[in-house]
Amino acid sequence: MRTIYEAKDFVRNNFGKTVNVKIHGIRNKNEIIKGIISECYKNIFIVNTNLFKRSFSYKDLLLGIIKIDVK
């Protein structure tokens, strides 16, 4: 993805689908979240898991802070 519009289109096209979100944290700490893309807004989108909701910005996707694998 090269633009914010491509990132938004990717998320919107996978709305309601089960995804794995790999989060690259500080000091090489990685976290993987399995959930469903449940909400899309202007600047953020929300992934629902069984236990909690987690919000991400489209910028995170562009910068490679998170990676989304659609299942």
Enumerate the language-model features and the residues they cover.
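Structural motif
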Residues: 18, 43-44
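Short glycine-rich, low-complexity segments
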Residues: 1-30, 50-71
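SH3/SH3-like beta-barrel fold
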Residues: 45-49
